């Protein structure tokens, strides 16, 4: 069995995977609320006392959470976890930018896209919206923009008259009230952002 995890600013997901690369069990945690008690409670789902863990690998953009999970697994189950950026990734990927400045989540996305044939622009919608560029298995860098939900929540937190809003597609650009106008701004605004950035990257990598 293998444990793999993705520790993000908003959410942490941890998976138990069998020898056929099939997800057996999954844990989801709010990254803002993670503590020792919660980690201990959630990992009971994996029933780790009765199985053998061959490897444990995380990609993490919150070092403190990784350290806490690694400490817990090592103390209670003698399982040592590795963080993606600490591995020798140059054996898989030719990285042409400052390695220390790239998040583990973005590197994981790039590694997942390697196939020796195609070039990729990889989009990831999380706390941040990221674009990463892979050409002939060479990681060229990317773009980081504010995430949709982060921006939407910040707007409602800072603007007194704008309520919490769930993002939905709007058929028309012009909103008829505050809520539909905000939805339109975010839906069409981010659609335009994505189209524009993707097109600019394509031009820059021709």
Regions found by a protein language model. Give the residues of each.
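N-terminal glycine/serine-rich phosphate-binding loop of ATP-dependent small-molecule kinases
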Residues: 1-3, 7-89
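Gly/Thr-rich phosphate-binding beta-strand-loop-beta motif of the actin/hexokinase/Hsp70
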Residues: 1-24, 113, 118-138, 155
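Glycine-rich phosphate-binding loop plus the immediately following alpha-helix
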Residues: 32-35, 112-117, 140-183, 188
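Glycine-rich phosphate-binding loop signature in dinucleotide/nucleotide-binding domains
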Residues: 48-52, 116-118, 204-206
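Short beta-strand-loop/turn "lid" adjacent to the catalytic site in phosphate-handling enzymes
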Residues: 50-102, 137-148, 176-191
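Acidic-glycine-rich active-site phosphate/pyrophosphate-binding loop
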Residues: 79-91, 127, 161-170
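Conserved phosphate-binding catalytic cores of ATP/NTP-utilizing and phosphoryl-transfer enzymes
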Residues: 90-120
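A short, acidic, amphipathic alpha-helical segment used as a generic capping/interface helix at domain edges
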Residues: 190-204
């Amino acid at each position: 069995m293998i444990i793999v995890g993705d520790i993000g600013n908003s959410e942490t997901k941890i998976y138990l995977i069998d020898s056929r690369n099939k997800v057996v069990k999954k844990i989801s945690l709010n990254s803002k609320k993670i503590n020792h008690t919660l980690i201990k409670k959630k990992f009971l789902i994996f029933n780790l006392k009765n199985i053998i863990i061959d490897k444990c690998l995380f990609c993490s953009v919150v070092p403190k959470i990784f350290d806490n999970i690694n400490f817990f697994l090592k103390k209670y189950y003698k399982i040592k976890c590795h963080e993606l950026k600490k591995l020798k990734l140059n054996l898989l990927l030719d990285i042409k930018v400052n390695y220390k400045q790239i998040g583990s989540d973005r590197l994981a996305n790039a590694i997942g896209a390697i196939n020796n044939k195609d070039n990729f622009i990889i989009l990831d919608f999380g706390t941040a919206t990221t674009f990463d560029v892979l050409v002939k298995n060479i990681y060229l860098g990317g773009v980081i923009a504010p995430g949709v939900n982060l921006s939407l929540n910040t707007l409602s937190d800072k603007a007194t008259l704008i309520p919490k809003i769930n993002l939905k597609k709007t058929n028309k650009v012009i909103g008829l009230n505050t809520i539909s106008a905000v939805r339109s701004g975010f839906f069409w605004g981010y659609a335009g952002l994505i189209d524009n950035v993707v097109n600019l990257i394509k031009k820059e990598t021709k």
